[in-house]
Amino acid sequence: FINTLSPDLKNRTIFNLETSERTKFSFVPIERRGTSFKDFDKYQKKAALKLLRASLSKKGYNKSEKIRQLEKVLLKIEIPRLVFKGKEIIRDYLDYHFWLFGVPSKDSLWGWKFEGHHVSFNFTLKNNKIISSTPSFLGANPAVVNIEGFKKLQVLKSEMNLGSMLVSSFNIKQNKIAQFSKNAPIDIITKNDFKARKISPLGINYNELNSLQKKLFLKLLNEYINNYRFGFAEDLRTKVYSSGIKKLHFAYAGEINSSKGFYYRIQGGDLLIEYDNIQNNANHVHTVVRDLSNDWAESILKDHYKGQHKIH
């Protein structure tokens, strides 16, 4: 990817690993630094997409690309145009940005970011291996598309359906434990904070589920984990399981299949997954995965810099 860029594009794409730009995290339509598809010729676009494809699973890559296509839908249906922070927003599926942090090589520590409206992936690599892919955000607006030419596209369908199926399976006692509010929060609770605040692990514990519910719960959990490239997905799965699958909780708020909105989260150990669908009469989904101890490879970078300090 780097080798396809002109000197000017390199200057706008490559940053130091230590820059605060690396840990900026946003999923709304704002102006961003880095370079975007709008800056690239067809060869650079191809190389950029190849980098993204190499960093995600096929499932994660396809979701990301379909979310970009939703910008075309919004361009058709948003009349009058959305005004955000005093500026009219013109939807553009090319307005997705790339940053590289540090010097990519098989022996170095470096990172890169892909971000635009409703997509944010943050990767850190060491010794040619992805060691962090969080925070990661995927959203969909509309959650279900019902206009000509898009065949009722529903990008985050499994996230919605599996969560709804799990809630629908609860008996009265389980539901009282799992539901922490009749009203869904207006957005994901951790927002786009650099450091996701630790929130209470409310809801029903994995041990309180029956065997079929446990299977549903794990299928839902893995729907999120399997967006990542296989190696990192397995590392994250191992971390979650080794810290104790029995410590995981599922909590929800609002109502399924309702225009009032639906929210759920999976939480345990360092893992936090949030799903929220309340905006636009519950047709606008936000999802996020956070590693409370290692977003942006925070814990690994601390050890790395400690080691450098000792050497000097």
Predicted regions and their residues:
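A cross-kingdom marker for long, charged
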Residues: F1-H312
